[in-house]
């Protein structure tokens, strides 16, 4: 379906999204040590030849990012409205995701298009007015359930999608958990919103339906908004939820759970989907 190109090829066995640098450590200032660090690069999403947004992101799983961002921002309603994705690396370290939309979707995008430059996973940068921040979301149906007895098992698997994080300690993760608590897949990124977008793109492409999203970060309003727009009914976060995240989750009937730790969880909204 997608024509994915890349101007950057990595040798077999090299983990995408990491590089090395010399560092000095406390009590050993006279010694240089080689350490791994996570790459962070500008990624431009270009729709039908027109630049829409530049985000700072990890340079991996970019096809999933293109799909997930397009879905979670309401640019498309189905991945099938994307005709092609070209991933083009530029000489200065930036990357362009050249996305070709259907004519109908591109016409809709042009009506509300704005140029914005995001910091690491920041979704509010560049909004022209407050009404641009909160998109209308239809209330979610109640078709999913999740047993909190499976939460510890789910948490134990999340780091398996963080190859870069294991080397650098520098990434967030988002995963899709089935009702039995098994991690079906996930993505990592230096930005928590980008990690979620990548995972939502993976979910769309693989066709996962039953389950919940598990993120390694806090639950901000945008994490809730993106999840709800993509039809996710249950969002599990390792850290806390913000007041606005709770408000939006309640309004759109999303089950929001924070402080997901071994043996612990705080349920903020719509506990009726949860089985204890």
Swiss-Prot record:
Mo-bis(molybdopterin guanine dinucleotide) binds at residues 259-264. Pfam families: FdhD-NarQ. GO terms for cellular component: cytoplasm. Keywords: Cytoplasm, Molybdenum cofactor biosynthesis. GO terms for biological process: Mo-molybdopterin cofactor biosynthetic process. The active site is at residue 122. Gene3D superfamilies: 3.10.20.10, Cytidine Deaminase, domain 2 (3.40.140.10). One of its GO terms (molecular function) is sulfurtransferase activity. InterPro entries: Cytidine_deaminase-like, FdhD. It is found in: Cytoplasm. Belongs to the FdhD family. NCBIfam families: fdhD_narQ (TIGR00129). Required for formate dehydrogenase (FDH) activity. Acts as a sulfur carrier protein that transfers sulfur from IscS to the molybdenum cofactor prior to its insertion into FDH. This is Sulfur carrier protein FdhD. It comes from Photorhabdus laumondii subsp. laumondii (strain DSM 15139 / CIP 105565 / TT01) (Photorhabdus luminescens subsp. laumondii).
């Amino acid at each position: 379906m997608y024509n994915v190109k890349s101007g950057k090829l990595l040798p077999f066995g090299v983990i995408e999204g990491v590089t090395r640098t010399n560092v000095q450590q406390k009590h050993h200032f006279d010694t240089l040590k080689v350490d791994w660090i996570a790459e962070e690069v500008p990624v431009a999403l270009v729709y039908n030849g027109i630049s829409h947004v530049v985000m700072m992101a990890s340079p991996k799983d970019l096809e999933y990012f293109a799909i997930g961002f397009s879905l979670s921002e309401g640019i498309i309603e189905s991945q099938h409205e994307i005709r092609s994705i070209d991933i083009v690396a530029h000489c200065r370290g930036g990357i362009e995701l050249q996305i070709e939309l259907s004519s109908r979707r591109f016409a809709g995008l042009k009506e509300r298009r704005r140029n914005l430059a995001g910091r690491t996973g920041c979704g509010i940068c560049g909004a022209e007015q407050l009404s641009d921040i909160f998109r209308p979301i239809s209330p979610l149906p109640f078709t999913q359930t999740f047993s909190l007895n499976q939460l510890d098992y789910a948490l134990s698997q999340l780091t398996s999608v963080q190859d870069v994080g294991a080397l650098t300690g520098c990434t967030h993760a988002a995963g899709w958990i089935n009702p039995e608590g098994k991690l079906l897949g996930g993505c990592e990124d230096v930005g928590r919103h980008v990690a979620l977008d990548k995972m939502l793109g993976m979910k769309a492409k693989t066709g996962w339906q039953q389950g919940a999203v598990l993120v390694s970060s806090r639950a901000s309003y945008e994490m809730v908004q993106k999840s709800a727009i993509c039809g996710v009914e249950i969002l599990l976060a390792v850290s806390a939820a913000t007041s606005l995240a709770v408000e939006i989750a309640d309004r759109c009937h999303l089950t929001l759970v924070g402080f997901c730790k071994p043996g612990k969880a705080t349920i903020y909204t719509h506990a009726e989907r949860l089985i204890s």
